[in-house]
Amino acid sequence: FKAYENVAQAMGGAMSTTGVPEGAPFVTGAQIGDSGTGLHLAIGLLAALHQANRTGQGQYVEVAMMDGVMNLCRVKFRDHQRLTRQELGEYSVPTYQGMGDVPRAGNDSGGGQLGNAIHCRPHGPNDWIYVVVQEAVWEALAKRIGPEVHHPDLATDPDLAKIADRRRHQAKMWGLLGKF
């Protein structure tokens, strides 16, 4: 059967994870269905060739674009499983244990880490960087940027010192990072 990228993204679950809260889902421009299907086909063909070399028997290899998309969405699917046990504190939108669906969360990182797109210098229309703020790097990052954003005590700011604090005060953290 023929497959179409945007339909595969919808059926494979990718669209349910993109977009902004309370808004329409988005298809990604990255063409994950086309590329993901090709990658999965290549893996299947290599496995079939290995089988043929070992046994002399060939195999029929079939891939579905929707399956390729689903595999590439595995982090969001893991977040869906995590929601059965806990809130997802890295999201900038509220989550709670047992809520069901992973929220469309704009540029939030998911997967347990705080992340977002930051408008950076010189603040032109295409001057963006994606930042993931892991616990292991926060102190060094805060000490580096703090003085430049007129917040020399950023590393020890009670709103931002610990990961739980940064989760509660993400808007403040992203705002300061955006000034850097």
For each feature predicted by the language model, list its residue ranges.
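Aromatic-enriched alpha-helical interface/lid elements that frame and gate functional surfaces
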Residues: 114-180
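Active-site-adjacent "lid/gating" segments in soluble enzymes
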Residues: 1-128, 132, 140-143
